[in-house]
Amino acid sequence: MITARRVARELALLSAAQVLRQPKLLDESDCRSLILMAVRTLASDVRDTLEQAGTELSESQRLLRHSEFQLPHLEKAQMVLQDALQRAEKGLNKIGAALDLPEILYFAHQEEVQAYAIALLRCLQRYQNEIEELVNRSMVDWQLERLTQLDRAIIEIAVVEMRYLEVAKQVAINEAIELAKRYSDEGSHRFINGVLRRISEALDPAQAATGN
């Protein structure tokens, strides 16, 4: 389910790298400019995703025609048919992903969404040193610098919510997992979940002691 805050997190994620490159603290106007760029990126994603879906579906149709008229051998025809079906499935999955994007774009223009995205970005920049220290302490046999830029931003946005914006820890973790599933590599969400759970326990020693 798409919510205003989920969209705000996506906008913050798409803007995070630019924010962390800035040598001085950004004001609200600077953040709004970055968010506008993020909205344009989302709009571009809609077009790209639909174009890719069309390409996959067209290729699947071509392969099916090829297998019907030019492949008399059953085994080879079956291989081509399997490839065609995989491409068709990939195209349909891309269309399914694109269906959410118009609603995301609708939310992205709302003031409450942009205001929350700005709060995330400004906290991310203002408390960067504290956030990095907390994340590094919670990594097991890993270092923050070795994370992909995307995974690092997802983790740090969740830390901002848990530590500075008083979002319930489990909510922040769950939302980070959803961001990872949407934007990061397959399997990254499990790693991110583990890191954030350790951070949650570090922020709440009583929770760590009881195991809840």
Swiss-Prot record:
Nucleotidyltransferase as UniProt keyword: no
A GO molecular-function descriptor: RNA binding
UniProt keyword Transcription regulation present: yes
Pfam families, per the entry: NusB (PF01029)
Gene3D superfamilies registered for this protein in UniProt: NusB-like (1.10.940.10)
Protein name: Transcription antitermination protein NusB
GO CC term, one of those recorded: cytosol
Coiled coil: none
Function: Involved in transcription antitermination. Required for transcription of ribosomal RNA (rRNA) genes. Binds specifically to the boxA antiterminator sequence of the ribosomal RNA (rrn) operons.
Superkingdom, taxonomy of origin: Bacteria
Gene Ontology BP terms: DNA-templated transcription termination; transcription antitermination
Alphabetical UniProt keywords: RNA-binding, Transcription, Transcription antitermination, Transcription regulation
Family note: Belongs to the NusB family.
Segments traversing the membrane: none
